[in-house]
């Protein structure tokens, strides 16, 4: 929970820009990724965090804002599936830190808001939502973002 809150605080702090934002994101994103690996397998009856979901317009605004805050190095190249390069003609694909961070935020923050509601069933749904979406979505975005942020920090 603490790692999710830290991530949200860094993203929501609009004054963080450029190198300062990159420096704040590195430990925060690494901590969030590590915490996700330890999430318990909780299977609630339902996951009621949908009422806190971000709209596409909200996501798009965050994506654009993060791209501007990161600056000209927001775009990067990566392999979609680094274990099977032949499936993709061995060509890298473009990534964008604004997309990575906005997608992580979209997967994390609604569940955090649900958790803050104090209802145990909502809390269980929040944990399950994080664990599930980590496995198939925001975990990969975290790794791509960390690799790129690391490179930007070490090669400035």
Feature map (PLM): residue ranges:
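Charged, amphipathic alpha-helical oligomerization/scaffolding segments
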Residues: 2-6, 24-31, 35, 61, ...
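Short glycine-rich, low-complexity/disordered patches
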Residues: 16-25, 45-48, 77-84, 122-128
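Residue-level signal for secondary-structure boundary elements
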Residues: 12-15, 19, 37, 44, ...
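N-terminal interaction modules that seed assembly of large macromolecular complexes
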Residues: 1-56
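Acidic, proline/glycine-rich low-complexity IDRs
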Residues: 89-95, 102-156
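Long amphipathic alpha-helical segments
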Residues: 41-112
